[in-house]
Amino acid sequence: MLDVCLLGCGGSMPIPDRNLTAMIVSYQGRKLLIDCGEGTQVSLKILGWKIRNIDVILFTHFHADHIAGLPGLLLTIANSGRLEPITIIGPYGLIKIVMGLKVIAPVLPYSIELVELHGKEKYFQKIGYFNINILSVDHGIPCFAYSIDVQRNRKFDREKALKNKVPLIFWSKLQKGEEIKQRDKLYTPDMVLGYGRRGLKISYCTDSRPSRELVEFVKKSDVFICEGMYGDDEKKHKAISYKHMIFSEAAVIAKEAEVEELWLTHFSPSLIEPQAYIENAKNIFKNTIIGQDRYVKSINFKE
């Protein structure tokens, strides 16, 4: 089971009851944060989620509404007693931005490992439980979408283990992926494991125009979290001008990508009641929700 939470659903500037953009994934006690707008810490505090075990921070791009909460978050993590390194991934400019934070936080008890993304190529990073796929998207400055895959272990096959005459004392280690050599015999995980099982896929895209590449990138996601800067179809010209999306465009991506759920987020501060426009998305992709700050859902593995 994996927990997904929208910490903030606002774009451009915060308004009452709507923090700026941030999303967090929690799995097996470890956390991955995407974007860190103003109010990120407030939402985490209200939820009671521990900050200390945030291992990875991903940035889509470096507009202030996506990054302004970072200095305070790093200092709070420092005060939590964390000593393990934190990995931060983001577009070109990441190194300068984080180095600039040294003015505010000159000494941290943990190291920061920086991964700076250049150009428009696709990237992949594996950090702990999280397999992170990265796609360059269409915004006014370098911007990236992220897809987080959590793999599921293959199922133990008792009949297969017995058929292969694997000693009982080796079953546990083989199930964990270890190989064991005894005398001239090599025992491998394949001798006790059955078929592969589908994991979970959470995809996240804000500040982008639609594209065919994005559809393929988020294909078959269990949850697709996508910006819906404007709800009204009549504001499409504005979305095109500022390189954002309207609700119906996000819904088309969700439908074509055959995702399980679409969560809309990153609303314009002028969009006070996004729920009023939900039918613009639902008419295209039924399983759509309007994101709210601190909306949490547990996503279960399917057999």
Swiss-Prot record:
Binding site for Zn(2+) 1: 61, 63, 139, 207
A Pfam entry, by short name: Lactamase_B
CDD domains: RNaseZ_ZiPD-like_MBL-fold
Cofactor(s) of this protein: Zn(2+)
The reaction(s) this protein catalyses: Endonucleolytic cleavage of RNA, removing extra 3' nucleotides from tRNA precursor, generating 3' termini of tRNAs. A 3'-hydroxy group is left at the tRNA terminus and a 5'-phosphoryl group is left at the trailer molecule
Residues engaged in binding Zn(2+) 2: 65-66, 207, 266
UniProt xrefs under SUPFAM superfamilies: Metallo-hydrolase/oxidoreductase
Keywords: Endonuclease, Hydrolase, Metal-binding, Nuclease, tRNA processing, Zinc
Signal peptide: none
Binding note for cofactor: Binds 2 Zn(2+) ions.
Family: Belongs to the RNase Z family.
PANTHER family: ZINC PHOSPHODIESTERASE ELAC PROTEIN 1 (PTHR46018:SF2)
Quaternary structure (record): Homodimer.
Function: Zinc phosphodiesterase, which displays some tRNA 3'-processing endonuclease activity. Probably involved in tRNA maturation, by removing a 3'-trailer from precursor tRNA.
Protein name: Ribonuclease Z
Species, as recorded: Clostridium kluyveri (strain ATCC 8527 / DSM 555 / NBRC 12016 / NCIMB 10680 / K1)
Gene: rnz
